[in-house]
């Protein structure tokens, strides 16, 4: 931390998934006047991301080793972040995988791996974070669900089911945190054009990581608990929920 600064006076933003395009776009917007902690595997190879955030005005940028799938390490990881940087003001859960749907339909281990990263690991981190922030009496958590989890489609049901589970867990946790001083914001993006979806045909009403980040920061500033990106997807998926199953099962990704 910058010489002379009190760690308790400077807000700390924890980005879990330190290489995530969306996560980094959010961190860039939150960087001015704050400390940023990037958590990722191979954390020693994040110099480009560190420099980007310093250029954006971060007071300090540090990295920590984070393996989302190693759930038994999550408690110690978060405890170490608090010990070194003080209170976590904002935590952004930006880790996850799409997986290969075709492979997951016949390879049980791959299906389990997708669900473990996209649901089980998130549940672990969220439970630890909620306990820490309850103790602080303040804090904000950003969780990424997806429209894929609002009504699961045949075309991506493994990933979609993990997001459906996460959406339900985060919704319940948000209610449990009501009145605690902790804000949980559940973000439901549609198709996001970026490295994670490279080579895939963009779906209608797609967004960029920058557009998602703008919506997230607006939501954090306004105290929102649900953010759809783009907003039009909320009424669209209200209608989608009502489609007969015979039509729904033929829906593309």
Please give the residue ranges for each predicted region.
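C-terminal helical subdomain
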Residues: 186, 201-238
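Active-site helix of classical SDR
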Residues: 126, 162
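Conserved glycine-rich cofactor-binding loop
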Residues: 19-21
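Conserved mid-core segment of classical short-chain dehydrogenase/reductases
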Residues: 96-112, 155
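Residue(s) in the substrate-gating loop at a strand-loop-helix junction
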Residues: 146
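Conserved glycine-rich Rossmann-like NAD(P)H-binding loop of the short-chain dehydrogenase/reductase
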Residues: 33-48
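Rossmann-fold cofactor-recognition segment
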Residues: 53-72
């Amino acid at each position: 931390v910058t010489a002379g600064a009190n760690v308790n006076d400077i807000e700390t933003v924890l980005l879990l998934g330190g290489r995530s395009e969306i996560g980094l776009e959010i961190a860039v917007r939150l960087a001015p006047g704050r400390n940023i902690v990037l958590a990722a595997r191979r954390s020693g190879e994040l110099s480009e991301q560190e420099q980007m955030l310093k250029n954006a005005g971060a007071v300090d940028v540090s990295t920590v080793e984070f393996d989302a799938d190693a759930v038994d390490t999550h408690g110690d990881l978060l405890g170490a972040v608090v010990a070194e940087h003080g209170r976590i003001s904002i935590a952004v859960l930006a880790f996850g995988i799409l997986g290969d749907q075709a492979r997951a339909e016949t390879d049980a281990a791959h299906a389990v791996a997708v669900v473990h990263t996209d649901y089980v690991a998130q549940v672990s981190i969220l439970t630890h974070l909620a306990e820490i922030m309850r103790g602080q009496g303040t804090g904000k958590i950003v969780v990424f669900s997806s429209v894929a989890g609002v009504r699961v489609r045949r075309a991506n049901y493994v990933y979609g089911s993990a997001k459906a589970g996460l959406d339900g867990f985060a919704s319940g946790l948000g209610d449990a945190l009501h009145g605690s001083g902790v804000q949980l914001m559940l973000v439901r993006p549609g198709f996001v054009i970026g490295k994670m979806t490279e080579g895939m045909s963009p779906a209608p009403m797609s967004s960029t990581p920058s557009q998602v980040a703008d919506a997230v920061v607006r939501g954090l500033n306004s105290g929102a608990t649900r953010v759809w990106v783009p907003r039009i997807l909320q009424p669209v998926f209200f209608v989608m929920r009502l489609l007969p199953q015979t039509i729904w099962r033929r829906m593309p990704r």
